Amino acid sequence: MASSRVDTINLRIWLVSIICAALSFINVTVHLIAINFPNLGFPCAYFEINDLKAVNLSANNEIYQMTHQLYINPVQIICYVLIMAILFLLIIIYYIVCCAKVFSSNKTSNVNQTTRDITWMGDTSSCFQFILIMDTFQLFVTALSFRLVALGAFAYSIFFVCFTTFNVTLITQFQSADKSFFAFQKIHPNLKGTVQFKTVVINLSELMLGYSTMFLGITTCLGVGNSIYIRSITVAFSSINTFLVMACIYSIVIEAVLVRYVKPLFGYYVGMFCGAVGLSFPILQYETFFESEWSTGLIINLSVVAIISIGFIICRLVRYLVKKKRRYKQLLNAESSSLMDENE
């Protein structure tokens, strides 16, 4: 049976959105590579936003100087940008593979089956959300290169919102593995492999979302700390507490709602733990530089985040392994129900 007109239109729009996402990925990749080299139009190295070794407090105490707050070190920033670029590449490959599989199996006897497959894999809206993620991430890195920390914090906030929306869209369009295997074995056996692929993509994306939650806290507080007069230690505590509150909210939403769609959803908790561990190294450097008596409190707050993340990992693992058995009761017929009514 030939594809319906609705399937044809949706398939063409989906193909155009994937092409746009691929072009955006090429643009962002070239930008992220070029920004690492001097004399290419970028004034500063984006990863040296908080170089504590080059600070001289006796000489750089003017009002127009950037205040050095708690932030991750250059190696961590470079690794974060690199891993995000790899994640972008993996998502592009996922969309291309899904598009190829749909084109190779679009002959079906079911009306609008292609539209349902596209919706399950990642429709046009998720593609454009992915484009917004890449563009806002590019803007964030560019703002760091120009030392515009307030603009960088604003750009990263938009990036984080788009990243969250993209993850929720992918997860909520996902059926359970049993239903997906059953549907694809009966209708489209060629699409069965996308179940595992999408699960991997979702967990890797959630892992980076968990780490980005930590990055959101320190980047937002870095922008606030350089926009208003506020103590550096207050900014440091605010960064960790923002990370803690946001991570707890996201973890509760995952366990309460999103696990109904994807059971093996461990990525966010692993990213949350990696964020807590990654932030511990800058705190030790922060203590050495400022000789702050508050470093113990910072470590305690960060340890709470790590413990909570481990607790959520154990909770998700237990809920994933323990299968609830439904007990089926025999339906009551008319006679038995009348006897029960008489007894009552």
UniProtKB/Swiss-Prot annotation:
Q: Which InterPro entries match?
A: Herpes_glycop_M
The record's principal subcellular location, in a coarse class, is: virion
Instruction: From the record, give the transmembrane residue ranges.
Output: 13-33, 77-97, 126-146, 148-168, 204-224, 239-259, 264-284, 294-314
Taken from the record's topology, the Virion surface segments are: 34-76, 147, 225-238, 285-293
Question: Which Pfam family would be a valid example here?
Answer: Herpes_glycop
Q: What ranges are annotated Intravirion (topological domains)? A: 1-12, 98-125, 169-203, 260-263, 315-344
- Note the superkingdom of the native organism: Viruses
**One GO term describing the cellular component:** viral envelope
Name the keywords, alphabetized: Disulfide bond, Glycoprotein, Host endosome, Host Golgi apparatus, Host membrane, Host nucleus, Membrane, Transmembrane, Transmembrane helix, Viral envelope protein, Virion
The UniProt entry lists membrane topology as: Multi-pass membrane protein
Q: Which family is annotated? A: Belongs to the herpesviridae glycoprotein M family.
Q: What does this protein do?
A: Envelope glycoprotein important for virion assembly and egress. Plays a role in the correct incorporation of gH-gL into virion membrane. Directs the glycoprotein N (gN) to the host trans-Golgi network.
Q: How does it assemble?
A: Interacts (via N-terminus) with gN (via N-terminus). The gM-gN heterodimer forms the gCII complex.
Q: What is this protein called?
A: Envelope glycoprotein M
Organism encoding this protein: Human herpesvirus 6B (strain Z29) (HHV-6 variant B)
Lineage of source species: Viruses, Duplodnaviria, Heunggongvirae, Peploviricota, Herviviricetes
